[in-house]
């Protein structure tokens, strides 16, 4: 049985940066907190907890404490509240996401901003939270806010960094007849595009596909969806313990793709379980 691991599997630049920054802070400072999960992966969150980093869900008054802003970013109000509450802020927001902030704020001056992304995702909330006016957020071409869209004369469309090109194109096709002046600024990151390009070929070349990553991970979800549409024998697992023996019976090749927040050791454990003993 041949096991083929995607070249783009595993951590993206922004995730690795946020984790490395957090570990360094844990070594240098005593009271270190992170608002929410630093990334969407339980193994990473657990490892950081063991190093002394405490996760909080709400900002409360603090003394001599450091607050890490997660890789997905956060609204401006979150930064302001943390400073008022006494925290020293260390911003681990992915630089690619910060670049989206800059683009969105610039475009807002003369456009209605439309975000193609998951409405409840931390990254999308962070982007929306940089703007003076609440943007319109669209998840799929099936949930267009038509009444609001028909009032828009000029719009700039930006994208959550992990969106698929197929979803973006489908939404843009629906928006073009509605909005007179419309321009797309595709702000999906390079790693996302690379992973999604690779996952379009791997399912054709392997008997089954394993997608490894958290069920809360947006980028992993999209990798799974793309692969599943091509190869029905695509399975989404978080760790090796979720492997089913029936999946690999009489299989000659297995393709593996790990999400952008999946540690290498998790992927390697899956590979070890798959190899015959």
Task: Please describe what each predicted stretch is.
Residues 1-277:
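The feature marks the mature, well-folded catalytic cores of soluble enzymes
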